[in-house]
Design a protein with these regions (language model features):
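Active-site-flanking segments in enzyme catalytic domains
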Residues: 3-168
Length: 168
């Protein structure tokens, strides 16, 4: 396995920053590592930009090796928004799609709304890098229908990690 560290950020054509990539079940690339400052540690920033990304990309490596239950793809089928995960249109124009907006639709992050593979790995990354209090708050804020969808997805994620990789 290879960790490839790139000093500067990468960007999509939409202008969104790319935090990391996973390739061929073997290589994880993390971008913007020159932004790390060991003299001024910011735990929230480390979690959001690096730890979540490492777990997210590692989860891609796992499913590139052994795919997850295809029933996961059907839970939010028709609700994935592709590159539009970053914003949504209202009568007032484009609005940023925040995580709390995504929660009520049954996604753990706005980025999870882009496609089912991202949805799957975001469940892993968010669960591993956040406290139980964060998860409980997310589920409460998601409302009854959003929480039910997240729970359904997470059950598949949990079973995949336990049954496929022996990780509980």
């Amino acid at each position: 396995k290879t960790f490839h560290l790139i000093g500067s950020p990468a960007y999509e054509s939409s202008g969104n920053m790319v935090l990391g990539t996973a390739e061929g079940g073997k290589k994880i690339t993390l971008y913007n590592v020159n932004d790390l400052n060991i003299k001024k540690i910011n735990i929230e920033k480390l979690n959001e930009y690096y730890f979540e990304t490492m777990h997210h990309e590692f989860a891609h490596i796992l499913h590139q090796k052994r795919n997850f239950d295809p029933s996961f793809n059907r839970i939010s089928e028709g609700k994935y928004v592709g590159a539009d995960w970053y914003y949504y249109m209202t009568a007032q124009g484009a609005m940023p799609r925040t995580d709390d907006v995504a929660w009520s639709d049954g996604f753990v992050t706005a980025y999870a709304m882009s496609q089912s593979n991202e949805d799957f790995v975001e469940n892993i990354a968010m669960y591993v890098t956040h406290t139980q209090a964060y998860w409980d708050n997310m589920m409460t804020a998601a409302g009854e229908s959003g929480a039910a969808i997240i729970n359904k997805k997470f059950t598949i994620v949990y079973n995949y990690m336990r049954d496929t990789w022996g990780i509980d």
